[in-house]
A protein has these predicted regions:
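A glycine-rich, Thr/Ser-enriched phosphate-binding loop motif common to dinucleotide/cofactor-binding enzymes
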Residues: 1-7
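Conserved nucleotide-cofactor-binding alpha/beta core module
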Residues: 10-138
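Active-site capping/gating segments
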Residues: 122-162
Length: 162
């Protein structure tokens, strides 16, 4: 699924990416390899900003990222990722690794014109739809259905309510 999501993001060297849901840090590391490949000039590097709502997961992901040598290309913070990460917005790409009830407006607002977001959307039951959200250079939003998926629910202000 990580590969499918990364391919759909159409990542390029130099992109600034917001990842909502850090998990172990694995997905952020794979994105960093594409947008900030070692061996390329640092001035061309992009950066991944990850927001994880569960403190223990965020701390583990940060430790994994640093130990794997990605600390200069990935920043992990603990907070409500459903609201995005306004400090570093706007983003070329946004990837959400938990299913939202709808596409959160703050994430769309923090996406650059010409940007792409990949997000699972649907109920908390086992199946959702992977959506590719594209913000045109005119600011208009287009969505493409990428198929059925099963993700944990997105929590936070713009996530599922329990």
């Amino acid at each position: 699924m990580v590969c499918i999501m990364n391919e759909a993001l159409e990542l390029e060297v130099g992109h600034k990416v917001l990842e909502v849901g850090g998990g172990s840090g694995w997905h952020a590391a794979t994105i960093a390899e594409i947008i900030a490949p070692k061996g390329s000039p640092r001035s061309e590097w992009g950066h991944v900003y990850t927001v994880e709502i569960v403190q223990a997961l965020g701390e583990n992901a940060r430790r994994h990222i640093i130990n794997a040598g990605y600390g200069d290309r990935v920043t992990i913070t603990v907070g409500d990722g459903s609201k995005g990460y306004l400090e570093k917005a706007p983003y070329d790409r946004v990837v959400v690794t938990a299913a939202a009830p709808d596409v959160p407006k703050p994430l769309v607002d923090q996406l650059k014109q010409g940007g792409i977001m990949i997000i699972p959307v649907g109920s908390v039951s086992m199946f959702q739809t992977l959506i590719k959200v594209m913000k045109g250079t005119d600011g208009k939003i287009r969505e493409e259905n990428l198929g059925g998926v099963a993700f944990v629910p997105l929590t936070g202000e713009f996530g599922h309510r329990f």
